[in-house]
Amino acid sequence: IAKSVFDALGADTYVINNNPNGLNINNNAGSTHIEGLQKFVVEKGLDVGFAYDGDADRCLCVDEKGNVITGDHILYIYGCYMKERGKLLTNTVVTTVMSNFGLYKAFDEQGIGYAKTAVGDKYVYEYMAKNGCRIGGEQSGHIIFSKYASTGDGILTSLKMMEVMLA
């Protein structure tokens, strides 16, 4: 599905590790084994690569140098992007207790508030819905954009990262 979405938007796309046989889900591929994507992005000279888990509710990214962009990075990047555009309505990004301390320090430096929940996108969304927050997620790449969904969506996360790249 991701390739169809990106192709429809005019992106040049490559797909790797997309031949499921019923037994090989996430087998040395996807968001839990991102090394192959890192190598592929660098060797092909690509701008970005996106890795999804088996049900595509998680997304991690690889930049042009092969660096992994975790869910914490995505929350920071898109949280700042939203704030710059006046779309971070509560000025709060929702995270879990597993997020890196550096994320909170970076949010503090940008004047962005944050909330910590128990691990699980269920708890992240619960807090978001109760408090009117627009973005939240987990280090693992479950990113929730409450304007569009109540759970993580890897393809949506990819599109949002591309939006920032093209801004």
How would you label these PLM feature ranges?
Residues 1-165:
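Phosphate-binding chemistry for phosphorylated carbohydrates and sugar-nucleotides
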